Amino acid sequence: MPRVKGGTVTRARRKKVLKLAKGYRGSKHVQFKAASTQLFVSYKYAFRDRKKRKSEFRRLWIARINAAARQNGLSYSKMMHGLKLAGVDMNRKMLADIAYNDEKTFAALAETAKKALA
């Protein structure tokens, strides 16, 4: 009897890898070795970028707050310091959302910060 090397187990494993590599360019979605190598790299990128996403959102929020604060005659750092002195306990995500969606409320917050700085 001939020897069966792996058989269904190997086929299932390779099929699983190629299914995960669906949508990759070139031979990376066809050839098992190229696909498994690319999957390894893709998982590394995914892990790294899950961590990076947090700082990228923080940068976006700060940019939005800064732009809105400058329209109201303050810099970002003075705005944040003024809000802290005034006892306004809002995080950057909330402030950025207000700056983006509700200009009147943000202007009121900017006035509060200005009064606290004076």
From Swiss-Prot:
| Keyword vocabulary terms for this entry | Ribonucleoprotein, Ribosomal protein, RNA-binding, rRNA-binding
Q: Which organism is it from?
A: Lactobacillus delbrueckii subsp. bulgaricus (strain ATCC BAA-365 / Lb-18)
Q: Which domain of life is it from?
A: Bacteria
Q: Which gene encodes it?
A: rplT
Against InterPro entries, the record matches this protein to: Ribosomal_bL20, RIBOSOMAL_L20_CS, Ribosomal_protein_bL20_C
What are the GO MF terms of this UniProt record? rRNA binding; structural constituent of ribosome
What Gene Ontology cellular-component terms does the record carry?
ribonucleoprotein complex; ribosome
Q: Spell out the SUPFAM superfamilies in the cross-references.
A: Ribosomal protein L20
Name listed for the protein in its UniProt record = Large ribosomal subunit protein bL20
Q: Name one GO biological process term.
A: translation
Q: Which family does it belong to?
A: Belongs to the bacterial ribosomal protein bL20 family.
